[in-house]
Amino acid sequence: MLARQLIPAIRDELKKLDAEPRGARASGRRAAMWRAQQHAVRRGSTVDDLRRYCLQSLRRRRFLEAEDENDYLRGYREGFQAVLSQIRRVETQRV
């Protein structure tokens, strides 16, 4: 399955963020979703590629322990987690 099929779901999540109050956390979520969307639009990118990209982004050392994490980084992590949730949702509907 091509990752492009997830772009409408990612856009829906971004629209929901537009309705929320602006702040560092929302900005971090938006940044993560934009990055995931840009990865999904690449030619030949599969859902597995997108999942791997999100998981690699979550593993990076820039993420601190929960108590030391600032709002932007927390939102960034939550954004990638939201994309992973969309991937799971699409895959379970497909089966």
Regions found by a protein language model. Name each.
Residues 6-9, 22, 38, 94:
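Generic low-complexity segments that are intrinsically disordered, proline-rich and/or Lys/Arg-biased
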Residues 27-28, 32, 75, 79:
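Periodic glycine anchor positions in long extracellular repeat architectures
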Residues 3-6, 40, 54, 64, ...:
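Compositionally biased, intrinsically disordered low-complexity regions enriched in proline and serine
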Residues 16-27, 42-45, 62-74, 92:
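Charged, low-complexity interaction regions
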Residues 35-49, 79-94:
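Amphipathic alpha-helical coiled-coil segments
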Residues 1-2, 93-95:
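Terminal, compositionally biased segments
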Residues 1-14, 26-30, 42-59:
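Short amphipathic alpha-helical heptad-repeat segments
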